[in-house]
From Swiss-Prot:
Gene Ontology process terms (BP): chromosome condensation
Family matches, as Pfam families: Bac_DNA_binding
UniProt similarity note: Belongs to the bacterial histone-like protein family.
Lineage: Bacteria, Bacillati, Bacillota, Clostridia, Eubacteriales
Top-level taxon in the UniProt lineage: Bacteria
Statement: the UniProt record of this protein carries the keyword DNA-binding: yes
Name of the protein in its database record: DNA-binding protein HU
Cysteines paired by S-S bonds: none
Keyword DNA-binding applies: yes
Keywords: DNA condensation, DNA-binding
Gene that this sequence comes from: hup
SMART domains from the UniProt entry: BHL
General function of this protein: Histone-like DNA-binding protein which is capable of wrapping DNA to stabilize it, and thus to prevent its denaturation under extreme environmental conditions.
GO molecular function per UniProt: DNA binding; structural constituent of chromatin
Length: 91
């Protein structure tokens, strides 16, 4: 399912127009992004948790030249599915 299909599905299930469903989805995504930028967790009970984790600096290797390169530390977004969501998917 792509973004357009998700918007259509949201509109049908919520009796919103596609435009309103698109605005709602954009607002949700922006709110999650803003919270993660501040280092906050976003917990949606029954669905899952969005959070950030620190990935340590490490050495990597250029596959073409075999040269060792340093990969800097970075912060990455992570989603952990909740139990109800996992159970529904594994039905």
């Amino acid at each position: 399912m792509n973004k357009a299909e998700l918007i259509t599905s949201m509109a049908e299930k919520s009796k919103l127009t596609k435009k309103d469903a698109e605005l709602a989805l954009k607002a949700l995504i922006e709110s999650v992004e803003e919270a993660l930028e501040k280092g906050e967790k976003v917990q949606l009970v029954g669905f899952g948790t969005f959070e950030t984790r620190e990935r340590a600096a490490r050495e990597g290797r250029n596959p073409r030249t075999k040269e060792v390169i340093n990969i800097p530390a970075t912060t990455v977004p992570v989603f952990k599915a909740g139990k109800e969501f996992k159970d529904k998917v594994n039905k």
